[in-house]
Amino acid sequence: MDPRSEVLLRQRHLFATPLLLAGLPADDLLAELPQAQGWSWHAGEQAQLDARFPDRSRFDTRAPTGAWTSAVLFLPKSRELTDYLLASLAARLPGGELFLVGEKRGGIERASKQLAAYGKPRKLDSARHCQLWQVRIEQAPAEPDLHALAQRYSLPLADGELQVVSLPGVFSHGRLDRGSALLLGQLQALPGGHLLDFGCGAGVLGAVLKRRYPASRLTLLDVDAFAVESSRLTLAANGLDGEVIAADGIDGAPRELAAIVSNPPFHQGVHTDYQASERLLQRAAEHLAPGGELRLVANSFLKYPPLIERHLGPCRTLAEGDGFRIYSARRS
């Protein structure tokens, strides 16, 4: 059981009426709280919840409707995303109770101050290195417009500016990260055919791929619902076509790909987690057509070349700079 869920269950008498669990982990919490429904924006956790608790959780960027008398937000990493989620929940709960639970190292003390916009916050419990806070909604806001909260910026490129649309919670929100900047300079001479932007974030790499290889089919994939929606908005802002899908890692990707291009993810909430990246390297060959190429950026200190060569083929370093390296390997 996730420690945040354990903290909630210490106060289970507060959660006997219909409530919404926003950002809930894929554990036994729904079994313990039969009146609860879930709202998830993580495709992997949603798949696990669907398998165990059919029709009790929804995958979306917007709060589901329901006769909730209270809601719990599991604190996400991003402050901007926390603002959006709290406002979304508070808008559905005039006079109701909104709870916030999170790890101390994840910033729950700081985030608890964000509850003050809706009433007087109070700490209910502290255990398992987590805290539980509560506020009664005295000032219910209007439901926030997610797209109005997007940060939009122009990326100057050799073939013209690219418009990027970044929603709260998306990696490197509102700016181009250093790894992707290095990879953008190494997208030449990719095989033609079906291209995949794995871990697409706001869709920068995928949009550049479609602009540079207009005849190629493009798929963008991310585990996060906000990233999926950001990528769709970025493609639309540039008049580009592409399929954007939500999936938990490379196992959810199409097969017979001409190339996989990636700045792979390495965070799960506040924790560093290289599992999705390592699984990409281990399974890329299963999703590439013969002669298909994996091209990715990674921190220089990560020992990826041996893993790439073990599972795919000879690994070349195409570029290095600013603490990152660009690796390339082809399926034989």
Swiss-Prot record:
One of its GO terms (cellular component) is cytoplasm. The keyword Methyltransferase applies. Keywords: Cytoplasm, Methyltransferase, rRNA processing, S-adenosyl-L-methionine, Transferase. One of its GO terms (molecular function) is nucleic acid binding. It is an enzyme of class 2 (transferase). It comes from the Bacteria. HAMAP family: 16SrRNA_methyltr_C. This is Ribosomal RNA small subunit methyltransferase C. The lineage of its organism: Bacteria, Pseudomonadati, Pseudomonadota, Gammaproteobacteria, Pseudomonadales.
